[in-house]
From Swiss-Prot:
Residue spans of biased composition, Polar residues class: 379-392
Ranges of the Cytoplasmic topological domain: 263-431
Omega-N-methylarginine modified-residue sites: R378
Membrane topology designation: Single-pass type I membrane protein
PROSITE patterns linked: IG_LIKE (PS50835)
UniProt record, GO biological process: cell-cell adhesion via plasma-membrane adhesion molecules; homophilic cell adhesion via plasma membrane adhesion molecules; positive regulation of long-term synaptic potentiation; regulation of presynapse assembly; trans-synaptic signaling
Segments passing through the bilayer: 242-262
A Pfam family it matches: Ig_3
Protein's organism: Homo sapiens
Repeat recorded as keyword: yes
Signal peptide segment: 1-22
Gene Ontology annotations for the cellular component aspect, listed alphabetically: cell-cell junction; plasma membrane; synapse
Protein name (database record): Immunoglobulin superfamily member 11
Other facts: The last 20 cytoplasmic amino acids are not required for the cell adhesion function.
Length: 431
């Protein structure tokens, strides 16, 4: 058998060749990094089986700072180039002469805002098959700006301080390294460093902590430094005058407050005492009327004692001071007495023939030879009222007494004067 070639075979081969020769954009490197201010080349190549008469190329960018707003970078269409967004004017162009299968572009004087994702869209009619988009990422690197160094905290000896270092710009984000500019280039033993945050914490600073410190900010494309002078302050003598003044002022204030409190207390106490005194009853009781006859006088001997003596008097209406009864002269019971020392006195008539005088119920004897009987009691026993021969007396209990008599002549010689005294009620009030 002989094989026969089909007449359709060449047409099939041409058809397969056309499919294989359709437009295809080459793989991109993925990402390109460039320092700010340096030119960047974004590659994009393709293959096609058709002529480049109808070539159409569009470059688009999706900014990193605003992913929702894609922008046109450059356009080639119908044999002409057109500018894209205003910020790319004068900085963007194709690397080769157009039309060509290499549609790469360049960006001069790259800026931080140029960072983003770039897309290359290629169309060349009649080729319509295959992948016609290429994607390239652009990252504009920024070296660290000059860092700013500062000290946070008190620089007094024994305190804790924090050294801060930061750069406003830097892509990628810079790291920070602190060092002390001395022979060892090492930080103090009490220091802890955070290279990401750019801080150094030095605890319990001392004189050895003083010195010049340097912060180095660095990233992939550059470094930058700043210097910081740390001077630990030694203790200063305090102002004794200010301290003494403050203490004195505080003491005066405290004393004033204490005096104010004491004054208020004593005022309150005296006020309460006055109110209590006002509540105590002070009644004067009248036991009986005074004698109606002015000529009739009752004589009363008043003796004061310096040691807790109490004066009492006999009743002018119920007692007989003077009597012509001889028994009266021998009666030693007292007419009046003093309670504490126990001394009591009685007046008696020395002449029984002298007539007695009664005035308003009172028996008076104005004769001569009058005597005074004194009864002394050394005890402190309570006293009771007693009545004997018309005379009223208080005698102590128990009755351990010593009596003696004072003659009328002796009374006249010492200047004794008969007086009238008010009587006492049972409650002790004078009337």
């Amino acid at each position: 058998m002989t094989s026969q070639r089909s007449p359709l075979a060449p047409l099939l081969l041409l058809s397969l060749h056309g499919v294989a020769a359709s437009l295809e954009v080459s793989e991109s490197p993925g990402s390109i990094q460039v320092a700010r201010g340096q030119p960047a080349v974004l590659p994009c190549t393709f293959t096609t089986s058709a002529a480049l008469i109808n070539l159409n190329v569009i470059w688009m960018v999706t900014p990193l700072s605003n992913a929702n707003q894609p922008e046109q970078v450059i356009l080639y269409q119908g044999g002409q180039m057109f500018d894209g967004a205003p910020r790319f004017h004068g900085r963007v162009g194709f690397t080769g002469t157009m039309p060509a299968t290499n549609v790469s572009i360049f960006i001069n004087n790259t800026q931080l805002s140029d960072t983003g994702t770039y897309q290359c869209l290629v169309n060349n009619l009649p080729d319509i098959g295959g992948r016609n988009i290429g994607v390239t990422g652009l990252t504009v690197l920024v070296p660290p700006s000059a860092p700013h160094c500062q000290i946070q905290g008190s620089q007094d000896i024994g305190s804790d301080v924090i050294l801060l270092c930061s750069s406003e710009e830097g892509i990628p984000r810079p790291t920070y390294l602190w060092e002390k500019l001395d022979n060892t280039l090492k930080l103090p033993p009490t220091a802890t460093q955070d290279q990401v945050q750019g801080t150094v914490t030095i605890r319990n600073i001392s004189a050895l902590s003083s010195g010049l410190y340097q912060c180095v900010a660095s990233n992939a494309i550059g470094t930058s430094t700043c210097l910081l002078d740390l001077q630990v302050i030694s203790p200063q003598p305090r102002n004794i005058g200010l301290i003494a003044g403050a203490i004195g002022t505080g003491a005066v204030i405290i004393i004033f407050c204490i005096a104010l409190i004491l004054g208020a207390f004593f005022y309150w106490r005296s006020k309460n005492k006055e109110e209590e005194e006002e509540e105590i009853p002070n009644e004067i009781r009248e036991d009986d009327l005074p004698p109606k006859c002015s000529s009739a006088k009752a004589f009363h001997t008043e003796i004061s004692s310096s040691d807790n003596n109490t004066l009492t008097s006999s009743n002018a209406y119920n007692s007989r001071y003077w009597s012509n009864n001889p028994k009266v002269h021998r009666n030693t019971e007292s007419v009046s007495h003093f309670s504490d020392l126990g001394q009591s006195f009685s007046f008696h008539s020395g002449n029984a023939n002298i007539p007695s005088i009664y005035a308003n119920g009172t028996h008076l004897v104005p004769g001569q030879h009058k005597t005074l009987v004194v009864t002394a009691n050394r005890g402190s026993s309570p006293q009771v009222m007693s009545r004997s021969n018309g005379s009223v007396s208080r005698k102590p209990r128990p009755p351990h007494t010593h009596s003696y008599t004072i003659s009328h002549a002796t009374l006249e010689r010492i200047g004794a004067v008969p007086v009238m005294v008010p009587a006492q009620s049972r409650a002790g009030s004078l009337v």
